[in-house]
Structure formats: structure tokens, C-alpha cells
Amino acid sequence: MKTSLLCGAAALCGAVAAGLLCAAAALAAPLNLPIWPDAPAGADSGEPREQDSTAGWHEHYIRNVRQASIDVYLPDAAKATGTGMIICPGGAFRFLTMEGEGERIAQWLNYRGIAGFILHYRLKPTAHSEFLFLLEMLHELPPLLDGSKIGEIGPLATPAIADGVQAVRFVRARAAQWHLAPDRIGMIGFSAGGMVTIGTSLTADAHDRPDFSAALYSGPLDVGHVPANAPPLFAAAAADDPLTAIGTRPIVAAWQAGGAPVELHIYQHGGHGFKKGTDSEHWTEDFSAWLQARHL
């Protein structure tokens, strides 16, 4: 039972292969900063603010986030480009896959001279007990992974997207402090974090949007009309991921219909989470080329 749970959970949260980002240097523990001046409307002010663990997945993940914050990863000043990216890990709005979809991504960005800011966005409450949490995931994750109950995840995105918008405001307001260009603040998200990225990219106030966006194997989000001035979007997914047809493809179609710039990569294999040893591992190369083409 435990093995089945871990396989399903790891697939849904989309842990990025450990070897993929091995070129990134290990960094010291990052500075963690709350992004709201006060608890946002609707936020649970109970303690603890979040729960940190490695149980079950045998890698770092966070759950029960009640108040949003960011981890700050700044590159070496000698290679800094002035670009920053807010990173939104996945985890079905139940947890955040901090290692594969957060820390390694930040380190890889730093290697390229880009500042990384891992967003701890608000999540659905789960059992405090690790054992009970794993039982919850055994029940809840499979129908989300196969798409049969994916509609239930949409409402959970609302507070997380609000945190995404606030994260853009927060980082942009401190651009000078972190030696960033305020018009070079991007956002990248994985799975549920892709939904946060897409929702943030379409917020009503254009000043609160990221300047460029990337969504990897995004969950489905009803985006409606996409304006022509929406941020340029890099999207990637795998053909053998059941969520690609209802997540990534409609999002890209909406970007195209609105006349906003978008680049799509569909890899033949990789499933939900870009499994190791598949052609989806090339996404970092494709994303690097996309960034370079935009002088980022």
C-alpha cells in the first residue's frame, strides 16, 4: 500500500529527476520571507505556519502552508543577469515538492545567473500525522492523476494564485535591493504550480503579472480570454500524461487565440512529472534556449 501511494504521489507532484540539475552548485540555506504584510483575507492564522518533512517521499516537501512566503536564492554577483524567477512547486495543492520542483530549480537558475524565489503558497489542510497524511494521499491522488476528479482541484487554486500575484509584487518592489531589473521578473510552475503561474500571468492588473512565464505539465485551469499583452509563455508536457489534453493544450490554445506569444513542447514520454530516462528530460535545454532568445 505504501509503495503504491508513493508512486502515485510522486507522479502527480512531478518530481524532477535528480540528475537533471546536477550542474547546479549546492547553496546555503536560503532566506525565507513572508510576502504579505498581514495575513491575507481568508488565511488561517493558526500555528504552525507550515509543516516541513521528508517522510514518505524521502525528499524535502512542505505541507499545511497557512501563510505564504518565499525562499530567496541569489546568484553569484559575478554571473548575475538581473533576471529573477518565482518558482511554484507542484503537489496537487496538498503539499509542495520542494526538492525536485523548488530547490534544484533555484540552484539551476542561479547557475545561469538568474535569481530564484521559491513560493510557499497556501495549501489545502492535511492531517498533521505523517501516517494519516499518507493515507489521505492514497485516497485522493489517484483520481487526480488520471483526470477523473481533476475538477475538484480548481477551487484550491484561488488562494494560491492570490499568493502568486503578491509574490510578483513583493519581488518587484525589492528589485533594486536584489539587483534585479523590475521588468525581468518571471514565474515558473510545475503541475499545480503551473496553475498558479497561469492564473498569476492573467491577473487583471498587468503590473502585477510576471514579465514571462513557464508552465510545466500544468494542471487544468479555466483561463477564459487571454489578452494579447499576456506574458510570453513557455509550456511543456508529455504526450503520455493524462492531464496534458485537459491542462497544457487548452492553456496554450487560449494563449494562441488571444495573440499572446507562446512556445509549446510536447515530449513523447515522461508522464506527469517528466520521469527520469525519458525525452522529457530535455526540457531544461529547451527552456534555456527560450530564455536566451529573449536575452534573459
Predicted regions and their residues:
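C-terminal catalytic histidine-bearing segment of alpha/beta-hydrolase fold enzymes
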Residues: L134, G258-L296
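Acidic beta-to-alpha connecting loop that harbors the catalytic carboxylate
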Residues: A39, A239-P242, H269-G271
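Primarily recognizes the serine-hydrolase "nucleophile elbow" in alpha/beta-hydrolase
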Residues: L156-A230
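Serine-hydrolase catalytic machinery in alpha/beta-hydrolase-like enzymes
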Residues: A39-R49, S53-I62, R66-S69, D76-T81, ...
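Conserved alpha/beta-hydrolase "acid-adjacent" motif
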Residues: P242-T248
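Short beta-strand/loop motif that positions the catalytic acidic residue
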Residues: F234-A237
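Bacterial N-terminal signal peptides
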Residues: G8-A24
